[in-house]
Amino acid sequence: MDDVLPLIGEPDTLVVTGSSAGGFATALLTDDVMARIPSAANVTACVDSALLYYDGWLQTARDLWRAPDAICERLTGDNIVLDALVALHRSHNDVKILFTGSTHDHDLQLYQTYIDTGIMSFEATYASSALYLDYLRRMRADMREQVPGIGLYTWEAGYNPKDGSTQHMIMPAPNCFIPLSGEKSVAEWLYDAAQGDVRSYGLELLEE
């Protein structure tokens, strides 16, 4: 950040986004980035493909990561991204918050299976794909309830008929610029949100 800041001047608009591990960082650290760029009054935070349920997030953050108290205090449940986004909304309710992910994310379901069972597998199954969809449905409901005004973009690109899994991450992928849900691509959805038009697409993919 110290090297980048002199190169960008004093922008009035800021988009913080990251995919996979970067998505978790986006949820946790957007307010830190904002503090480094105080000129940006128009801020959008977009989490891409970051969702893991785990009862030990607080202990992990405190004892393993040695995270600062400001982060640990946000972690009250089993969904670190939800906790972080709720805290971000409460402290900066003018920040536009977005979440995007695929319906049966291949990589995330592998890690979720490891958390749930203690067994690390490198192969998805129809069962683990279905379970991940249930977790995503729960996440969607919680985000819409606890983060008013959030924009969601759900998609199912990269479907693998062998195991029912779908693509992991969209922001760094070429199909970020292709409409996957509705008439908008993820890139267009993010651009619109940064301009103040926050919408949701692909919610029908999460219906029971």
Task: List each language-model region with its residue ranges.
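C-terminal His-loop and adjacent cap/lid subdomain of alpha/beta-hydrolase
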Residues: 1-208
